[in-house]
Amino acid sequence: MGSTPFCYSINPSPSKLDFTRTHVFSPVSKQFYLDLSSFSGKPGGVSGFRSRRALLGVKAATALVEKEEKREAVTEKKKKSRVLVAGGGIGGLVFALAAKKKGFDVLVFEKDLSAIRGEGKYRGPIQIQSNALAALEAIDIEVAEQVMEAGCITGDRINGLVDGISGTWYVKFDTFTPAASRGLPVTRVISRMTLQQILARAVGEDVIRNESNVVDFEDSGDKVTVVLENGQRYEGDLLVGADGIWSKVRNNLFGRSEATYSGYTCYTGIADFIPADIESVGYRVFLGHKQYFVSSDVGGGKMQWYAFHEEPAGGADAPNGMKKRLFEIFDGWCDNVLDLLHATEEEAILRRDIYDRSPGFTWGKGRVTLLGDSIHAMQPNMGQGGCMAIEDSFQLALELDEAWKQSVETTTPVDVVSSLKRYEESRRLRVAIIHAMARMAAIMASTYKAYLGVGLGPLSFLTKFRVPHPGRVGGRFFVDIAMPSMLDWVLGGNSEKLQGRPPSCRLTDKADDRLREWFEDDDALERTIKGEWYLIPHGDDCCVSETLCLTKDEDQPCIVGSEPDQDFPGMRIVIPSSQVSKMHARVIYKDGAFFLMDLRSEHGTYVTDNEGRRYRATPNFPARFRSSDIIEFGSDKKAAFRVKVIRKTPKSTRKNESNNDKLLQTA
């Protein structure tokens, strides 16, 4: 694997990191040789004095290194104590890696290493944000590089909240600046299977016991013994429960307790689909009333999506009926949502109810503690569930290592119990705040109302007046103010605890130079769309049956009219309708955008935008139209077309081509 260039800064600027140069630290070897010939001089002279002083300095430094090596040797010898880990998910494997790197003897017990918590390969990718990637770097830089190379960067693009019906931006998230300003890796998504394979390979086959389900444990005060489902028993010095939201270790510690149902069921799937704005947008959260939809680029020409809907737990769909129900739930939503559903195969869709667990004030007892979902399972809305488990893993390994060092210095037994308490205390507040944020994000996403009248039953007619809902206006004001500080703390608030990790940004993480412009200018962001533009016949009464492809040649004019014109040098769209004039309208492409100009037609040209507002185009004045708009040539709706933008895919990707054909047929 080729090395990746790094940009290091000893004193990084809080506002900007230089991505233009590469600085590399050269580690100092413990075994070093110095040429002392330059210090030779006359005995008793200044040069001789300096020579003796330099030699003494070297001897002192050598003695210090030898003392440190002896201390490390003693420490490594004492660290042959055993750490038991229940659960081989992300949290369990990352902690096992961290503990192993610190010199501990680790054993991981997992009931089914191939299942990814029972949801198989279709559960898809997981988002690893900057804070977790930095913690992983502090644990093992080589493993972190493998993860980052295998992942798809989303933090270098626009991410945020949009209106589910219109698809217009509500709030944009800047996850790049907090990472770059603090010298952190940029957020990525990676396949769970790939991530688990990388971690398992780094931990080692000799450490992981597959098909080993921990059902009980015994804490004698000096040792901990785990009991497997098959009756086997293993003894160690401490036990870490990383066995997920339904943790058996947690139940045995504190008694059985019910997880908290979020009120939402979640459908999820992966589609072979490339959006037209893939270069500029990483992920979106589409907001709605009592439902919301999340889509994210996961690399390799694939998109992952989650569809949340408020309903009681325990529901089920008819056989092969999930896709049909999703179209019913999200009927009338924007093309960004519907296109993904169309492109997803029925068998690639999973459904699960969403639960979480409140962290609580006590994470463990005696020589047993908990980590990740087993103590603070979160709703997926912040994308921080796995990230918090990785942070937990680093901190727990650090506290155990500090306890060993203290025992070596004081020649006293290792205080395992106190080290576990310190781990819990150091993590409790941050985890509780982010856990609460995840719950709040779910509430905000599902109670969103674009217009006054939404969700008001008999008063729903008010929505036709398009009066912005007060909650929408106030919510946006609050989010605009609070979001930058919140993201800065979530992504960078733990970085100061990552001992031994210098602030650094990978040169390959550099964002597009236009990123700041995209944040501030929706129009500039929209012009980054790359795809073919189509006019698709709209409505049962449309007099045209074929789909029309628009040209993006700025030098070739395009005229819409009722009669062909052999002498016309440009593109001619002929619509045989009584309300379409001979020279009805002109379509213009300029600087990445399409415009429509009515040529003083008798019956006019009308545009209905993605928020449902219909207006008549002013004659001889170019009017911008966008994807999902409805264009009517004449007022009788017999020449109505829906604007559609579809990414142009390589001819070799037949599956994507068939998806594009499917989108054209179903639009």
Curated annotation (Swiss-Prot):
Changing residue 125 to A: In aba1-3; ABA-deficient phenotype. Keywords: Abscisic acid biosynthesis, Chloroplast, FAD, Flavoprotein, Oxidoreductase, Plastid, Stress response, Transit peptide. GO terms for cellular component: chloroplast; chloroplast envelope; membrane; plastid. It is found in: Plastid, Chloroplast. Its cofactor is FAD. Disruption phenotype: Increased endogenous level of zeaxanthin and reduced level of ABA. Reduced size of leaves, inflorescences and flowers, early flowering, increased number of wilted plants, premature seed germination and reduced osmotic water permeability and ability to close stomata. Reduced susceptibility to virulent isolates of P.parasitica and sensitivity to BABA-induced priming. Pfam families: FAD_binding_3, FHA. It is an enzyme of class 1 (oxidoreductase). Residues 1-59 form a transit peptide. Residues 558-612 form the FHA domain. Changing residue 160 to S: In aba1-6; ABA-deficient phenotype. It comes from the Eukaryota. FAD binds at residues 82-110, 360-373. Its EC number is 1.14.15.21. GO terms for molecular function: FAD binding; zeaxanthin epoxidase activity. Expressed in leaves, stems and flowers, and at lower levels in roots and siliques. It catalyses: all-trans-zeaxanthin + 4 reduced [2Fe-2S]-[ferredoxin] + 2 O2 + 4 H(+) = all-trans-violaxanthin + 4 oxidized [2Fe-2S]-[ferredoxin] + 2 H2O. Zeaxanthin epoxidase that plays an important role in the xanthophyll cycle and abscisic acid (ABA) biosynthesis. Converts zeaxanthin into antheraxanthin and subsequently violaxanthin. Required for resistance to osmotic and drought stresses, ABA-dependent stomatal closure, seed development and dormancy, modulation of defense gene expression and disease resistance and non-photochemical quencing (NPQ). Through its role in ABA biosynthesis, regulates the expression of stress-responsive genes such as RD29A during osmotic stress and is required for normal plant growth during vegetative development. This is Zeaxanthin epoxidase, chloroplastic. The gene is ZEP.
